[in-house]
From Swiss-Prot:
Its main location: cytoplasm. Centrosomal protein which may be required for microtubule attachment to centrosomes. This is Centrosomal protein CEP57L1. PANTHER family: CENTROSOMAL PROTEIN CEP57L1, UNCHARACTERIZED DUF1167. It comes from Mus musculus (Mouse). Residues 244-258 have a biased composition (Polar residues). Residues 222-261, 314-400 are annotated as: Disordered. Pfam families: Cep57_CLD, Cep57_MT_bd. It comes from the Eukaryota.
Amino acid sequence: MDSELSQSMVGSYLNPPERMHLPSFTQNEAFQNCHPGTPPKMFNSPNNQALVSALKTLQEKIRRLELERTQAEDNLNLLSREAAQYKKALEEETNERNLAHQELIKQKKDISIQLSSAQSRCILLEKQLEYTKRMVLNVEREKTMILEQQAQLQREKEQDQMKLHAKLEKLHVLEKECLRLTATRQTAEDKIKCLEEKLKEEEHQRRLFQDRACEKTNCLKREPPQQRDHKFRTPTFERKKPFRTTSQARANPQSSGEPVSICDSLSELLMTMEEELDQMNMEHRELLRQTMQPGNHSVSEDIEQELEQLAKKMESKGDQISKLKKHQDSVRKLQEKIENSRINESSGIHGNPKGSKNLKTSPRKCVSETSSFQRDRGFQPVQVHSLQSKLRRDDIKWEQ
């Protein structure tokens, strides 16, 4: 019986009493019908009634406990939700605090950087203030010096005015002297004009004389060749030596005069270029001496630039002098060759009095020699001309 009650009324943890179904009246009747011989002892005894009432009270308590348990579960769920919300709010608050802390650290760093920059600016401003103080002191000193210089200039101006007054007096005297000199110059110009007129007349007379001489030479050229041959025909053995000597005497100054004049002009040009080089050396030394003296930096830079330009000019001048010396040597060698050739030609003419072979072998040479003997000072060797043109074109480079 206890087991049946325990199974029917009490229930278990898995099957609580509120979920158990009590047997209804029909079920009890069916049960009684199934067991008709058994009397209902359970409902008749007082203990059973007490037990049923106890079970009812117990069932009520179990219901209450179940209600409390459900309420407790609801409260627990509510508390868990509130705890989750609180945790979330706490996390958000901590995140906000962390962000605020980081922002505060960043602001502190920015403030420290600004403070360091402000300190550096303060140091720079202090230095600038010190520099401005020094500048003000220097300006005051310069102001005092300028005032002193102005006073000195005023005194010098007064002295200059006195000197100017004296110079004006001298200028007045010089003007009088100038007027006198202009009068004398006018008279001298009149005399010069007279002399120029006389010179013009003399030039006119000289031209007339030259025209007459040209007419006479033309008349001599127009004479027939027989008369000229008759005039100049002489014995060959008597006239050959004088003709050669005179022609040689004429040809030697003509042939040697041009190279000698070229050599003289080259030597004069070389001397002038060497004098210019010496002058450049003196200027170079003077500029070096100026650079050694303490002075302004810009002036020293200008002097250095002048030194560089002067050094380049000296180098070019040295190259020109060396080239000119080489050409002077070549001209001398050429002159020696020409003289040797002239000597050989003259010795060949003297050694062959008949001159038949030379005339046969080189008729042009003989014709050129005879024509050169008959010319005046218009003879110029071809080699000297070529050398002169080469020297003028290529090697003499004048500085601009």
